[in-house]
Amino acid sequence: MAKDTPNGAATRGRFITFEGGEGAGKSTQIKLLAERLNAGRIRCVLTREPGGSPGAEIIRHMILSGIGSLIGGTEAETLLFAAARDDHVHTVIEPALAQGSWVLCDRFTDSTRAYQGQMGAVAPALLNAMQRVTIGDLKPDLTIILDVPVEIGVKRARLRRGAAEPDRFEAESLEFHRKLREAYRQIAADEPQRCVLIDANAKVKPVAAKVWAAVQKRLLYSKVSAVQHA
């Protein structure tokens, strides 16, 4: 449970984002981390982008189906991502953090930088402007970037969806995914205080152990100790 401050207000929660290419295992690792945190009596909210709120989920369908890219190209699609994020942040993320919950989010602004910035040739000025409008001063306390070789990630994604049609990003070329992987690795190198790059080319449990170690080291060590001795 979230602890209360002396004036009765809940201590603000922590914001953890998970990033990586297709088939990196983000959804699986988020669920496993939530289980560990819940076991330590830390309340969690699991969410995702694009989507995460009713309005943003509608926009998610437009983006992943390819409808968004037909409206006005890459820049118009970036505006759709921004609209979805604005709704998501103000209706889900910020309220949950204010109530003391820890928010675990499958993709956030780094995905915009990687997909729309690196791949779509969207001007950095537009990306920065959209970020200021949609999230203000909100930043993840920790970003886990799951790194996996492209061929393995694409194969995992294909096995996961089965007979379903790939979404517009899954259907991109291997070269697209290679550049995307490098974009994420560069983000991790540029912001080591926020980001932890984890080799996800392994079984689920060893990767989960690395994620848990990163959370303990960066955010949770003193809190876990307090919970264990409560």
Swiss-Prot record:
Keyword Mitochondrion: no
UniProt-listed Enzyme Commission number(s): 2.7.4.9
Alphabetized GO MF terms: ATP binding; dTMP kinase activity
Domain of life of the organism encoding this protein: Bacteria
Alphabetical list of PROSITE patterns matching this protein: THYMIDYLATE_KINASE
GO term, biological process aspect, one: dUDP biosynthetic process
Family membership: Belongs to the thymidylate kinase family.
Full protein name: Thymidylate kinase
Organism whose genome encodes this protein: Rhodopseudomonas palustris (strain BisB18)
